[in-house]
Every structure is written in structure tokens, then in C-alpha cells.
Amino acid sequence: MINDAHCHFFSPQFFGALARQQLAMRAAPSAMVAASASEIYRELQWDDPVAADTLADRWIAELDRHGVNRSVLIASVPGDESSVGEAVARHPSRFVGFFMLDPSVTDAIERARRAIDELHLRGICLFPAMHHVALSDQRVRRIVEVAAERPGVIVFVHCGVLSVGVRRKLGLPSHFDLRLGNPIEVANLALAFPQVPFIIPHFGAGLLREALIAADGCANIHLDTSSSNSWTRYTPGLTLDAVFNTALAVVGPSRLLFGTDSSFFPRGWQKGIYDTQKQIVEDAGVSAADAARLFGGNFDRLFPAS
């Protein structure tokens, strides 16, 4: 059984947000958003998502084609909770909804409550480097309190290297403060809220050592394996095999979550990432039971099917 703990839902609203940023850079009228979004599809050579329900159905067909049982869908811009909420409502047994939240906006708490209570989303995604809000900030603590009050809700924290490929391709500025994405700061939150599961994606995205230290000290911190993990190039000689072996030794198979970081069509679900990681796990001599946990069981434990 395969469950994917990290897929992005690039909805029409996601592309609309990019279009508005492009138009602002050009000092162009905001009324041109639809035309600008169409231009983005052509420039990237990506498919038009058409509508949230259409995109949700396409993802189901794609998961079925690859034998994937369930998947996380991440609303990839703040304010796009409704798109993922629509996908989850349409396919509740297949999708688990996450949403990106900017702690600096005045209605962050209300947005979080609505996303969880009304739209039935189950993961709050924090990007401290992107939104320039430290994890030690009281605004973040209040957001985690929302999760703590709602059993079954997790907090996902992007740490380490943050490079948004679509922004780079479109020439959009990415003023990220990478100093704020330290997994050790996640440990402080995890210790304060032991009932809340935390997920650090991409093995810490270049901060593997810190991610392992944080997870070793906090039983409620999980690591996801998603993406090609190209951050390994920052450490001479480091291989993805070594990353898996070290994470398995320190964190164990019960707190690793397989993910691909799939996002757009026509590329669809990234089977190559699954194939690579499956081979690494087999080569490491991981038992069938532990491999089943990593590739699906841990997901179902964190997100029991409703």
C-alpha cells in the first residue's frame, strides 16, 4: 500500500495568486488576472487546472493509475483553503487536506479554525522563512494551540532550504529568511505541545543533522522523505542512501513518512521518486513490515480514514 504524505494542489486560485504578483511587478491592471494566469500555463507548459473539482478528479485518476491509496493535498498559497477543502469533500476517503498559513495576517487564527472545523482540513503548514515569522513568535504558538485543541490535526513546518521552482521560473522575487527555518526551533514547539504531531518535510531540506536532533528528542516529530532531496549536494559526498540509513537509525521507521512533492500536470504523480526511495529502503535491508509503515502505515496512523 502506498500513501503519499506530500502533494501540492495547484488550483486555479494558486495560479491566480501568481498572476496577481506578476501583474503587480509590471504595474499592470489587476483585472488582467485571468489572462495572466493563462499566460503562466503556457510559459510553464503546464495544464490549466480548470476548476478545483476537475483537478481533484484528475488527481484521483492519477493516483489510481499508480496504485496510490491516499494522499495529502497541500493548499500552496495562503488563502486557498477552500480549493483543497472542495477536493477533500469530493473524495474524503482518498485525500487529507493541508493548508499554508501566514501567521502574520491578522485573521490567521480565524482562518485556521475555519479550515479545520468547516473544511475538515487536517494539517497546518508553516513556512517561517517565507513569511518571516520565527517559530518562537507568540503568533505561531497561538496557531499551534489551535491544533492542540483539535485531536488529529498536525503541524507541518518547512525548514532548511526553500526554493520555489515555479516562482524562480516566472522571475518572481523570493525574499526568504532561511535563518528562521531551523528544525531545532520545531523541537521547542514539539516539547511545548507533546499531543500535536509535527512533520518536517524533505528530511529538513539541508538541515538533516538538526532535523535528526529535533526528532530524536521529541517523539511527536516526524520527517517526510519527499522530493528528489537535491539539497544533499550541499554536503560533499552525501547520498540519499546515507540519508535514509541515518534517519532510520536515529528516528526509526515509525516516524518517517513517504512523500513525492508531486504538484502539476502533465507531469502528475512522480513515480520515479517512489521507485528510487523504494529501492533505497530495500537495499538498506528494511523489513517488509517497517517498509509498509514508511510507505503507508504511518500515514494511516496519523490520518485515520474517516
Where are these predicted regions, by residue range?
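Mid-to-C-terminal alpha-helical segments outside catalytic/metal-binding sites
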Residues: 1-5, 12-65, 70, 114, ...
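A general structural detector for well-ordered alpha-helical segments in enzyme core domains, enriched
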Residues: 58-62, 83-87, 111-115, 139-143, ...
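Short beta-strand segments
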Residues: 4, 72-75, 199-201, 224, ...
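Short, surface-exposed connector motifs at secondary-structure boundaries
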Residues: 65-70, 92-95, 191-198
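Active-site gating/metal-coordination segments in enzymes
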Residues: 69-70, 76-168, 172-177
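Active-site environment of divalent metal-dependent phosphoester hydrolases
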Residues: 10-12, 78-80, 104-107, 161-165, ...
